[in-house]
């Protein structure tokens, strides 16, 4: 009887150990699966952040000439046109969620997207980018968008939230006369620093010094 009881007790203990081991194994498998999914998710996010973003093609400024009588004076830069394209392999970039930070002398301004009224269709060209009527809708804290290449219509089909995809080309339009009205725009020989910050991916640095003198209305800055 005692041997039988001991045998049954041992069997019960053995079964309990097997059950505990099975439960533990299930927990480990579940945890392992979660960690694997989490690692894959983090990896995808990291890849997206590294490859995504915008690159600057060129930056142009507009310094209009003001004529009074026989005297012509070249004003400060009153408008900026920043030509941008997505990085190679970038995820789509929503310009509605993009921010631009610019610092001129002691003034820093954060620009946000100005809405569908500040989006212009330039896919068929523009006679003079700085004289287009779209500038009338751009104030000192908003930026507009000139759409140059939009093969899949990702920007023009939804002007309220334009998305840039691979192969697209756009111009970010900034009214520097209103943004930096303290200086009447951007003066000659002035350092301009800033960043274009997309909703994901690395920010794009702006770092330039304007020419010592403005000899023409259209000035390539970067």
Swiss-Prot record:
Transmembrane segments: none annotated. InterPro entries: Flagellin/pilin_N_arc, Flagellin_arc. It comes from the Archaea. It holds the Pfam family Arch_flagellin. One of its GO terms (biological process) is archaeal or bacterial-type flagellum-dependent cell motility. GO terms for cellular component: archaeal-type flagellum. It is found in: Archaeal flagellum. The keyword Cell division does not apply. Keywords: Archaeal flagellum. Residues 1-4 form a propeptide. GO terms for molecular function: structural molecule activity. Belongs to the archaeal flagellin family. Flagellin is the subunit protein which polymerizes to form the filaments of archaeal flagella. This is Flagellin B5. It comes from Pyrococcus abyssi (strain GE5 / Orsay). The lineage of its organism: Archaea, Methanobacteriati, Methanobacteriota, Thermococci, Thermococcales.
């Amino acid at each position: 009887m005692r041997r039988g009881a001991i045998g049954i007790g041992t069997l019960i203990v053995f079964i309990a150990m097997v059950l505990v081991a099975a439960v533990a194994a299930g927990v480990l498998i579940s945890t392992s699966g979660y960690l694997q999914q989490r690692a894959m998710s983090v990896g995808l996010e990291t890849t997206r952040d590294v490859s995504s973003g915008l690159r600057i093609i060129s930056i142009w400024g507009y310094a209009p000439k003001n004529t009074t009588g026989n005297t012509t004076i070249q004003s400060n830069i009153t408008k900026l046109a920043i030509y941008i394209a997505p990085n190679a392999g970038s995820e789509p970039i929503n310009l509605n969620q993009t921010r631009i930070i610019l610092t001129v002398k002691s003034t820093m301004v954060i620009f946000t997207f100005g809405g569908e009224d500040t989006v212009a269709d330039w896919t068929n060209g523009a006679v003079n980018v700085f004289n287009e009527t779209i500038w009338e809708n751009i104030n000192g804290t908003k930026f507009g968008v000139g759409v140059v290449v939009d093969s899949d219509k990702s920007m023009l089909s939804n002007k309220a939230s334009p998305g840039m995809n691979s192969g697209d080309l756009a111009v970010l339009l900034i009214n520097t006369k209103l943004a930096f009205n303290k200086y009447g725009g951007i003066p000659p020989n002035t350092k301009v620093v800033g960043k274009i910050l997309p909703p994901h991916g690395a920010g794009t640095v702006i770092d330039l010094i304007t020419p010592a003198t403005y000899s023409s209305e259209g000035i390539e800055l970067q």
